Amino acid sequence: MRPAFDADVIIAGAGLSGLSLAVALLDAGLPEDARVVLVDPRETLSGADRTWCFFDLVPHAFESAITHRWSRWRVRNGAAEVLRSAPGISYCTIPGERFYELALERLAAAGQRIELVLGVTVEHLEDRGAHVDVHTSAGVLRARLAMDSRPPSLTRAADDGNDVNLLQHFRGRVVRSTEPVFEADTATLMDFDVSQADGIHFIYVLPFDAHTALVESTFFTERPLPDAVYEAAIDTWLTRRLPGVVFQTISHESGVIPMTTEPFDAWPSPRIVRIGTAGGHVKPSSGYAFLAVQRFVREFAPRVVSALRVDGCAEPPAARSRRTIALDTIFLSYLRSRPERAPDTFYRLFERVPPAVLARFLSDTGTLADDLTVMRTSDSPRLALEAIRATPLLRRKTR
């Protein structure tokens, strides 16, 4: 590497996408004389306040970080309940601390090729043609390529009147009881038998054993709510579903995920690539991101390694296909125009669509046949009407 550069690649942010890309670069054969620097504003990297969940549909580098698998998944709507499973498919979770532990172990074994710079904030990136200037709170760093995983501000969904902009926001707690009250093999993905007064709302439950579970209150609305709203919803759900049971709170977690039809500018300049949420790797209609990030870095990392060998640029693969963008646009447009229909619509999806097909659809790994099955067996007439209403959006998103 030429002395004029502080790094071959600088990654702004050491979260899910930043660490996943760094690991993927090693797997792709990052040269021994190359240098990758991850810059993160946190003093200590820890994922104790988050988990990533997904259907285990594609292989990835963090299989050993999976701590729980559920062979069945449930959706409730009022008194109605649908319970589903699919051969060879589980719903999985990776706790944030396990992900960080595994990723950091891999990076530490890479020696001088990987460096973590903590307690430093990346302020902005400037493509200078032959290199990138990374402006930070500690000064300017120079790199051949820069990857920007800094998430957008999500205190409120922007609304320009054209695109659909919602937020998936949640707060949850891990609770434990002395009594065995949870079904350890069944994840409750959506329980809509809760108040809908503040917008589309459901409870999400991941039992880790018969005594312990993560219980989250989740909303699809334009802005997050006070913590007390989520906490009250969890208390109400626990009291109604498990009356008389005393719970101890072990930990809390919260988050905000964009659900938007706005396009993401993932390649703002030849030497700067946006990744993760900033790169559009979150599926707008479901909020799932883990598998999308893993698919992206697995395809992108070899391009970066090849670019470094010739001092070139690396074009990122498309985060999502035109087909899936179109389907999410229709679905989000429908949720915006008919939020009161959301519980029935989601319930029908899980009730009518074959579980393996729906798992692939929700994870953006489905085929055209899968997508047609979902459209044909879901709330078809209303979604067809929404497709007509969303036509101007579709033209802008898919051209």
Question: Where would I find each of the regions flagged by the language model?
Answer:
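FAD-binding beta-loop-beta segment adjacent to the flavin cofactor pocket
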Residues: A197-I200, G255-I275, P284, Y334-E340, ...
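A conserved beta-strand/loop capping segment in the N-terminal third of enzymes
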Residues: D56-G119, E123-A130
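Flavin-binding catalytic cores
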Residues: R223-E253, P270-V273, R295-A319
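Long, low-complexity C-terminal extensions of enzymes
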Residues: Q294, R298-R399
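Beta1/beta-strand and adjacent pyrophosphate-binding region of the FAD-binding site
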Residues: R2-S17, V37
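Predominantly flavin-linked oxidoreductase catalytic cores and closely associated redox partners
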Residues: A24, A28, R106, A110-F247, ...
